[in-house]
Amino acid sequence: MWILIYLFIIWSSLRTWVTAVDSTTTVGDDLNETVSTSVWPTMSPQMTVAFRSQRDVMGNLTIDQLPYVGLNLRRVLLNNETSMVNEGNNTRLLTLFKSMLSSEANAFVLDLEQYNNDLRVVDTTLLFSDVLIALQSFIFSTQNNLYANIIVLLLNISAPELDSTEYRHQNQTLNTTYILDKNLGNSFIYKPTDLQSDRAKNNTWNIYGKSSIDGWPTLGSVLYEQKKRLVIGELTDFFNETTAPYIFPHDVFHYEQGNSTLDCPSTVEGLTDLSSIHWRFLDSLFNSVDIKEYISCGLSPIISNSAYVNNVTQLADIIHEGSVWSWDSDQPSVTQSTSKSGSSSGTLEAYNCVLLYYFANNETVTWRVGNCYNSNIGLCRYENMAFRWLVRSNKATYFDFDSYQGSKCPDQYSFNIPRSPLEQRSFIAYMRNSSFSDTQIWIDLNSISVSNCWVSGGPYASCPYEKVISRRNFVTMMVPASVCSFALLCIVVYLSVLRVPIYDNRKNWRRVINKISKSELEGVPS
């Protein structure tokens, strides 16, 4: 019995320990997890962390204002695959498409044509349903907080060469809802009805604040609350609300080809006016230099460069330059643990906080990891105004700049960070107008709680990807259970080795009792 009790105690202690270990799984363990690809270069751990942290910073931006980097699939994917398509090798095309999904591109333009009451990819024998199945597979494999992101699919529909009566009949018999439901599932699609519902619930915003008229939901709301991953839009005028209720009409998107008609803003008023335009796409040829400029001007580039399998890496570099608009080329530094250490000079070091570097000579900025214990000035934003900044002149460590005791930012300002290329552009304009020289500035981004998990919300913000148990809390939790287990173990060992005195003297007691019983007289005394 005692042995069973002891084994139960040991099992309980081990279970507690395993639970604690499981709950402290770090994001660093996930750095080597990437969606497998066979054509496109996979993202390095550093690039994965940079892309994820950027997505998290943009969590409170509306999905129509996000900087997307896209690919025109007809120009990029299908221009050199004609012979392969004629051979009926659709597997190769789907492999290329899947590898592109695993890149940093998150918008795709797809040309379709109607074919026997179905939709087919132009110049191929590939059906739209095949593309949707590949898309569904990718969404399933990335449907978690680490890898989930919004994908925009823009459709160019070619009408069949029929007279007007036949065209209307073909259009009405084409059931896009059935195609999407069967091959993708509507649970992943953010639909026009979802937008209507969000606006009715006052869950949408524009540049001025909440708006039930022309607002859109935030990235965080769509990804994490509604679990939506895909926005489908039409660039032509083939469908209508009845024939394609899952697809946004063409007038929702500002889509241009070649050169943009939108000016690149340099004032707060210009930035505000540009932000009132939803879904700003530019389909053109780009290189790794000018794509960054278009991104900083608030446009989402759709790359139409002709690409081949042997130079796909060059195209991947262009996408990367447009996708990562914040971090420096070798940032953020990927670490395996978060710890506080002392340097040879005796000062504390913790490289888990982010500095924004401003270079006055070419008016550029970039993000780099810095020592949280160094003293620097910090960046403040005025209430909920996206483009109104203030840099405090008083220096402080990262922990002191925004702490439980209060922020170094003045009233109505808060410690903050540029959340988009447009906001970063407005910050550059502020620095230029204020005549700042080269400067290093604390911004609200750190990985103090968990290595490689970059979060906003001050020095005490927690990582959303894991439940953190510190070493101190772990020891506090384990010591009582260990002491009790050891004490009970000692008792069990003592009772199993040593005999109780009464048990040892059992025979002696029996002999004494027998002797006493013999001395007693039998019968009734006279």
From Swiss-Prot:
Residue numbers on the Cytoplasmic membrane side: 499-526
Signal peptide, first to last residue: 1-20
Keyword DNA damage: no
Membrane topology (UniProt): Single-pass type I membrane protein
Cellular component per GO, a single term: membrane
Carbohydrate attachment residues: 32, 60, 80, 89, 156, 171, 175, 202, 240, 259, 311, 362, 433
Extracellular face of the membrane: 21-477
Localization, UniProt: Membrane
InterPro entries per UniProt: Telomere_Capping_Maintenance (IPR051008)
Listed transmembrane segments: 478-498
Reported function: May be involved in telomere capping.
Family as reported in the entry's similarity comment: Belongs to the MTC6 family.
The protein's name in its UniProt record: Maintenance of telomere capping protein 6
Protein's organism: Saccharomyces cerevisiae (strain RM11-1a) (Baker's yeast)
